[in-house]
């Protein structure tokens, strides 16, 4: 099993004087792929960019959106598969896309998308779909197709060759939103100011999670155990998460309590934030994972490289 760091192209220079052996590249769209090979770290995974170029300009990556967006996504994916195959890159990780849950069923959209994925030639590269959490800005009319283990299991039945990337932080975020979703959906339908209601949802979730820390801790731990009982992921994104601080700051992702160093206990954007995930639970359940990627957001609140080193030592000490 390999342990990698996740880096955008802009952050690669930060790792020049480190001894990390492997990295997963988070692509932005316009980089020279071959330049990613010119590093001391070995490139072992590509994370598909969040944007894609279409004949009408940039658009968000969404394999489920029919027409030119999906066509552009598959063209880019085929380019990445060829590059990965030719250069010994083992994994490509993608976010599958979104659907309008008021107009379509998840099953119908996944079945349509799976037909096209089943025609892909992956050239010996493992293509993995990542769990993407539902949240106030990613729900209902624009809901991720693959948010939890049930969704991933369904897609694997339709597309047997597909691999899975489990993002621990995303699992926690989706677990919290899932607890409130039914009640929010009933109110959302009749809400005229939906932007305002997104803020209300966030405020209500923060209030309840802070008042019921033990409940949500147990809930997330249970979902982690359930995930590993149903799927052994091919790769894992190891990320800290504070479910008491899932809050957009100045309207920008990541959430304050998202994408934290493992075991973090300190200030983030002028608030005290604590990683509330018991990472020993998932680390002890790994059986077939080939890659663990350390992922944390580059913030001024902590020493990014030092946190990466500490996280690397922590995970190394606990992997089976």
Predicted features and spans:
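Short amphipathic alpha-helices and their capping/turn segments at secondary-structure boundaries
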Residues: 27-44, 76-86, 110-119, 148-158, ...
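Gly/Pro-rich active-site loop or hairpin
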Residues: 55-70, 139-148, 171-289
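Glycine-rich loops and low-complexity Gly/Arg-rich segments
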Residues: 28, 68-72, 116-119, 151-155, ...
């Amino acid at each position: 099993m390999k342990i990698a760091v996740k880096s955008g192209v802009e952050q690669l220079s930060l790792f020049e004087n480190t001894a990390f052996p492997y990295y997963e590249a988070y692509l932005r769209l316009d980089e020279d792929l071959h330049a990613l090979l010119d590093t001391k770290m070995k490139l072992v995974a590509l994370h598909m960019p969040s944007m894609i170029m279409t004949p009408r300009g940039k658009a968000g990556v969404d394999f489920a959106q029919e027409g030119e967006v999906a066509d552009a996504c598959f063209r880019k994916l085929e380019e990445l598969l060829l590059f990965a195959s030719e250069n010994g890159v083992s994994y490509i990780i993608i976010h599958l896309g979104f659907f309008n849950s008021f107009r379509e069923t998840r099953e119908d959209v996944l079945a349509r998308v799976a037909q096209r994925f089943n025609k892909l030639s992956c050239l010996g590269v493992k293509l993995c779909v990542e769990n993407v959490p539902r949240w106030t800005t990613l729900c209902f009319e624009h809901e991720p197709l693959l948010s939890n283990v049930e969704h991933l299991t369904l897609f694997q039945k339709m597309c047997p060759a597909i691999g899975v990337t489990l993002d621990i932080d995303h699992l926690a975020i989706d677990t919290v939103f899932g607890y409130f979703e039914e009640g929010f959906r009933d109110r959302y339908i009749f809400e005229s100011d939906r932007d305002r209601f997104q803020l209300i949802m966030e405020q209500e979730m923060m209030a309840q999670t802070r008042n019921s820390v033990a409940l949500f801790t147990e809930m997330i731990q249970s979902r982690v155990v359930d995930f590993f009982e149903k799927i052994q992921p091919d790769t894992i994104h190891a990320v800290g998460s504070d479910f008491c601080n899932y809050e957009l700051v100045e309207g920008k992702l990541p959430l304050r309590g998202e994408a934290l160093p493992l075991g973090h206990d300190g200030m983030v954007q002028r608030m005290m934030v604590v990683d509330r995930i018991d990472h020993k639970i998932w680390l002890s359940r790994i059986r077939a994972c080939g890659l663990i990627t350390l992922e944390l957001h580059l913030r001024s609140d902590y020493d990014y490289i030092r946190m990466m080193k500490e996280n690397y030592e922590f995970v190394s000490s606990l992997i089976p």
